[in-house]
Amino acid sequence: MALAAARRVLLQAGSRLGRRGAVDGARRFSNKRVLVEKEGEAGIAVMKFKNPPVNSLSLEFLTEFVISLEKLENDKSIRGVILTSERPGIFSAGLDLMEMYGRNPAHYAEYWKAVQELWLRLYLSNLTLISAINGASPAGGCLMALTCDYRIMADNSKYTIGLNESLLGIVAPFWLKDNYVNTIGHRAAERALQLGTLFPPAEALKVGLVDEVVPEDQVHSKARSVMAKWFTIPDHSRQLTKSMMRKATADNLIKQREADIQNFTSFISRDSIQKSLHVYLEKLKQKKG
């Protein structure tokens, strides 16, 4: 109920913002946590994450992101979207641990449903999606990148990408595991998931987690040039092929959404898991201090 109400309010606000005039040849609409720059003549929109300090996937961010994506999917002038961070250095730190710690089961269920929705909307989108990974991308940040049709990462050894949930004492959901296996292969995914491996750019390229590694100042220009190449393919044939390749993986979640929510809620509510999250959060506080 709360998520649906938030979606209605944000859609109304987004509609008002979407009617503003063009700015420097690009139309923008924005909410607190996502900035969208539309380049209608090129058929491209750029979605920039702006949820400081680390672009964590809070419930509010997830809601605003899905609404922004929905607006773009309904815009006939847009054929592709580039996902990136407004703040270089951090693509997204992933799921917001504060949404999973010290809350009640109803909140955990609402949050996990929003996480599922993010993945499904991105994974099944008819738009061409390219991630311009201009910073660290662990866990949920990697989730968003994995849904894209093409991934470009900045060549900076300080940046890493991967699903490191096991290091936090939690487990990646089966549908994200499937996405990972489809991307880097079963054995590489099995090893990386158990160890919580975070890959620097060169290693991410080697295992197939990203498609290109480029100098940091060329990430966005490369994303645009790659998008232009994808635009040479007729939309209908590309979309049908994408659906054919991804439908079985997505259906695996769609058929089990409620069970997955219940499993997550039960798992995250365990005392042992809450204690693990508490320890991890305390370590983060000490690092900041």
Curated annotation (Swiss-Prot):
Residues carrying N6-succinyllysine: K48, K71, K222, K229, K255, K275, K283
PTM annotation (N6-acetyllysine): residues: K48, K76, K222, K229, K255, K283
Documented EC number(s): 5.3.3.8
Location relative to the cell: Mitochondrion matrix
Residues binding substrate: A93, G94, L95, D96, L97, G140, N164
InterPro entries assigned to the protein according to its UniProt record, in alphabetical order: ClpP/crotonase-like_dom_sf (IPR029045), Enoyl-CoA_hyd/isom_CS (IPR018376), Enoyl-CoA_hydra/iso (IPR001753)
Cellular-component GO terms for this entry: mitochondrial matrix; mitochondrion
CDD domains named among the record's database cross-references: crotonase-like
Pfam families cross-referenced by the UniProt entry: ECH_1 (PF00378)
Site (Important for catalytic activity): E165
Keywords assigned by UniProt, alphabetized: Acetylation, Fatty acid metabolism, Isomerase, Lipid metabolism, Mitochondrion, Transit peptide
Family the entry assigns: Belongs to the enoyl-CoA hydratase/isomerase family.
Self-association state and partner proteins as the record states: Homotrimer.
Name of the protein described by the UniProt record: Enoyl-CoA delta isomerase 1, mitochondrial
